[in-house]
Amino acid sequence: MTTTYKILVLPGDHIGPEIMAEAIKVLTTIETHRPNLHFNLTTDLVGGTSIDTHGVPITQSVLDAAKASDAVLFGSIGGPEWAGVHPTPESGLLQLRQHLDAFANLRPCEFLVPSLVGASPIREHVVKGTRFIVVRENCGGAYFGEKKEEEDVASDLWVYTRPEIERLARVSAAVARIMGRSEDDNQAATVWSADKANVLASGRLWRRITSDIFAKEFPDITLQHQLADSMAMLMVRDPRRFNGVIHTDNTFGDILSDISGAITGTLGLMPSASLCGVPGEGHRSNGIYEPVHGSAPDISGKGLANPVAQILSVAMMLRYSMGLEKEATAVERAVVKVLDAKSEGGLEIRTGDLGGRATCSQVGDAVCEVLGPLLQGKKA
């Protein structure tokens, strides 16, 4: 029996189509070695290309197609040719998130490739072994609260409700369980909840409701509370301290996610996800999967783009929207084999941003070549 997954593919602008082509190669490779899986791909426009064709950064038909899909694979959007255009290309992504109610943003921070730890601006002995995921509430808080702005005074209402906090807590718990399974020990990862309960009423509500949910529904998962400002400091001094899942609101999640990106020092390797539901509950959970980096118009069309973040976004999609852990892990292991130094047993096939000379398509081809045997149960 074949299981079919509907995926909406939105390559976007500039390097978006280039890196997306390599991600689709990965899905095709999985289909070749997993005859019981089929990925039904529909490709459409978003961002600047949608503005050029339709006059808007995303059409209603694309929004409807996204809601009817099992997942959305998103490229990158924007560029200087759309400067001053309103609505902006980037607003297409915001509309997509709002339409799907993609309330949980996931940003991994880890050194998947051992020999690239040196890319971090922080000393290797401090960051080596770091592995956490920031789970950020994406649809509430100060960014979406009522705003007042006058000549000499302005305010942003920082509001959270019980349902908003509860649903994110359930996502954080699910991600902690999935992290534990991926480490082959079946022990859920620790969840670190970041707030400002010492000064913010919304922070006290956040801490109380998060504690209630974990005590009642996830008593086996370790929950720790940390003030967000001290977490930001400690994340730089000792990032391994927070290995596991960081569960936090929109504002603090925005800040902590950017710090996590600086820790790795390699935006070209960083995927992300915005989930519309709790993963791993025996049903499909829609989500938007995209690289963290931008559209890089300076290298567009030159074959220089690094496709790895887009490929790792595929791995996140397989894991969180489809529950295909073995396939997700195989994709990650293929990436490690391709990028890792020859001295570490890797192929050291890298694009220019990582000090190599390989083209975008050469990296994608190499990942697929390694992935095939891994899907058959062979070692890389």
UniProtKB/Swiss-Prot annotation:
This is 3-isopropylmalate dehydrogenase. It catalyses: (2R,3S)-3-isopropylmalate + NAD(+) = 4-methyl-2-oxopentanoate + CO2 + NADH. It comes from the Eukaryota. Homodimer. Binds 1 Mg(2+) or Mn(2+) ion per subunit. Pfam families: Iso_dh. Substrate binds at R97, R107, R136, D229. Its cofactor is Mg(2+); Mn(2+). InterPro entries: IsoCit/isopropylmalate_DH_CS, IsoPropMal-DH-like_dom, Isopropylmalate_DH. Its EC number is 1.1.1.85. It comes from Hapsidospora chrysogena (Acremonium chrysogenum). One of its GO terms (cellular component) is cytosol. One of its GO terms (molecular function) is 3-isopropylmalate dehydrogenase activity.
